[in-house]
Amino acid sequence: MYKPICGLARDGLPIIGVFALATLVFALLRWPCLATISLLSTIFSFNFFRDPDRTSPTENGIAVSPADGVVCKLGEAADPITGEMRQVVCVFMNVFNVHVNRSPVTGVVSEVRYIPGKFFNASLDKASTDNERNVIVVTDAEGARFTVVQIAGLIARRIVCPAKAGDTLSRGERYGMIKFGSRLDVYLPHGYHPAVAMGQKTMAGVTVLAKKAD
């Protein structure tokens, strides 16, 4: 759905192109300081928009992390769609993480909702309710609903989500990204429990985020 181009997130290509072109222009004009700054920006953009292939685990009854980052919150919170209290796992992404987001499970996108908001630091609790965010609900073959929320942060003000209601996603499949660092919240369906700890590093599409209770 959201396939990379030459190992890079497609939404990053225009930004990389602008910095690369600026580097060339400044070099031709013999403006070394600006050429150096543009070159460093190009290198940073290449690193930021990298989108490596991942192999997801195949065992049943699990959900994988939708984002690279660090687990910044575990607990209960109201599902932004239904209002039900659910177990929630929050993953904070900094500017050095891969920022492409992946589906935690195989299922059908049953709902997509964009919610405008503010741009507080994404590590704050109020970011879940006050910040700009995009919500998708992925319903698996057993009817379990996973609510995944992309949250814009203090720096990241650009949420990308081409997924739409009716689309089918595979576990670990790319479905969007948030530019320049932010946060992903996953509201687990009843019967699933977190399989990660506070402060644990996660890898999108690989780290087992939650497991179904026996």
Curated annotation (Swiss-Prot):
Membrane topology, record value: Peripheral membrane protein
The alphabetical list of record keywords is:
Cell membrane, Decarboxylase, Lipid biosynthesis, Lipid metabolism, Lyase, Membrane, Phospholipid biosynthesis, Phospholipid metabolism, Pyruvate, Zymogen
The answer, when asked if Lipid metabolism is one of the entry's keywords, is yes
Pfam families cross-referenced by the UniProt entry: PS_Dcarbxylase
Entry-annotated residues carrying Pyruvic acid (Ser): S182
Q: Where is this site: Cleavage (non-hydrolytic)?
A: G181, S182
Report the GO molecular function annotations. phosphatidylserine decarboxylase activity
Q: Which NCBIfam families match?
A: PRK05305.1-2 (NF003678), PRK05305.2-5 (NF003685)
What is the protein's known function? Catalyzes the formation of phosphatidylethanolamine (PtdEtn) from phosphatidylserine (PtdSer).
Return the similarity comment. Answer: Belongs to the phosphatidylserine decarboxylase family. PSD-A subfamily.
Protein name (record): Phosphatidylserine decarboxylase proenzyme
Q: Which organism is it from?
A: Solidesulfovibrio magneticus (strain ATCC 700980 / DSM 13731 / RS-1)
Q: Which gene encodes it?
A: psd
